[in-house]
UniProtKB/Swiss-Prot annotation:
Family statement: Belongs to the bacterial ribosomal protein bL33 family.
Gene Ontology CC terms: chloroplast; ribonucleoprotein complex; ribosome
Protein encoded by which gene: rpl33
Gene Ontology annotations of biological process type: translation
Family annotation (InterPro entries): Ribosomal_bL33, Ribosomal_bL33_CS, Ribosomal_bL33_sf, Ribosomal_zn-bd
Stretch forming the signal peptide: none
Descriptive protein name: Large ribosomal subunit protein bL33c
A single GO molecular function term of this UniProt record: structural constituent of ribosome
Length: 66
């Protein structure tokens, strides 16, 4: 039997600080995390505070499109 859309989807979280600084070339790179989210519980874009190895501090990582 065919299922509908999967409830759990794989998402990519990207550092918002590095993404803004990427235009100015101040940062060495962009920190990204791969995780999963439940589409029914969190239909909106996910934002988590995670450690960025390029900024050397905890920053907000937001969900990006694939």
């Amino acid at each position: 039997m065919a299922k509908g859309k999967d409830v759990r989807v794989i998402i990519i979280l990207e550092c918002t600080g590095c993404a803004r600084n990427g235009l100015n070339k101040e940062s060495r790179g962009i920190s990204r995390y791969i995780t999963q989210k439940n589409r029914h519980n969190t239909p909106s874009r996910l934002e988590l505070k995670k450690f960025c190895s390029y900024c050397y501090k905890h920053t907000i990582h937001a969900e990006i499109k694939k």
